[in-house]
C-alpha cells in the first residue's frame, strides 16, 4: 500500500530548500508532508522522526470524521504545526515505529491523533483527499480549478510532480487520457453555464476556448446538439415548469 503522507517531528532545527524555496524549521515543530515531496526532506532525516500514513489509514480517518473527499486542486505540499505536546508526540511516534506495535485498534487511534494535530490547518483535508484520489481524479480536480486556463499536459505534471510519460501511463491504466478529462470537464462546465449564461462567446471563453466556432463544434460533437439548441431546450423546460406551477396554483385556489 503506497504512502499518502508523513507526519514529521523535528527534534533538531535545520534550514532546507524545499521546492526551490528556503525554509527554517524549528526544534519541536511538526510537519505533515505530502508523499509527492517527501524526497525533498531526505537529506535532513537526521533532524527528525516520522511516521508514514498509507491510503487505507487515510480513508478510514476520512470516514470516521465524516469528511467528504471533495478537494481543491494543487494543495500545499506540506503543513506546519506548533504548540504541540512534543514529549507525548515523540513517544507516540516511537511506539508506532516500534516492533511492539501489536494492538491494531490502539495503534490506529494513535495514527488518527497524529493526523488530527493538523485538523485546523488550511489545506489539511485537501492534502489528505488528493492523496487518495485516482490519478484521473487528481487531474480532473486541477483542471476544474480554472477551466478558462489553456491547460497543457506539462502544467498538470508540474502540479503533480510527475513526468509526462508517467502521467500518460497512469491515465492509460485508468482507461482515460488528459485530453479526454479536459474535454469532459469543459463540456460539463459549458452545459452548466448554458443554464444561466446567454452568450455563447462568453461560455466558450470561460471554458478555455479561444475560438467560439471550435467550441460550438466540440460541444455539438460531445452532446449531439449546438449550445443554442441546448439553451433553447432549457428555456422551454423552465417555461413549461413555470406554467405547470401556475396551473397548480390556480387549481389550488
UniProtKB/Swiss-Prot annotation:
Molecular-function GO term, any one: sequence-specific DNA binding
Secretion signal: which residues? none
Q: Which residues bind DNA?
A: 154-175, 200-223
State the disulfide connectivity. Answer: none
The record's keywords, sorted A to Z, are: Activator, DNA-binding, Transcription, Transcription regulation
Any stretches that span the bilayer, and where are they?
none
- Superkingdom, according to UniProt? Bacteria
User: Does this entry carry the keyword Transcription regulation?
Assistant: yes
Q: What induces it?
A: Induced by EvgA.
Instruction: Note the InterPro entries from the entry.
Output: Homeodomain-like_sf (IPR009057), HTH_AraC (IPR018060), HTH_AraC-typ_CS (IPR018062), Tscrpt_reg_AraC-type_HTH (IPR020449)
**For the HTH araC/xylS-type domain, which residue ranges apply?**
137-233
Question: What does it do?
Answer: Induces the expression of gadE and mdtEF. Could also regulate the expression of other genes involved in acid resistance.
Identification of the protein by name: HTH-type transcriptional regulator YdeO
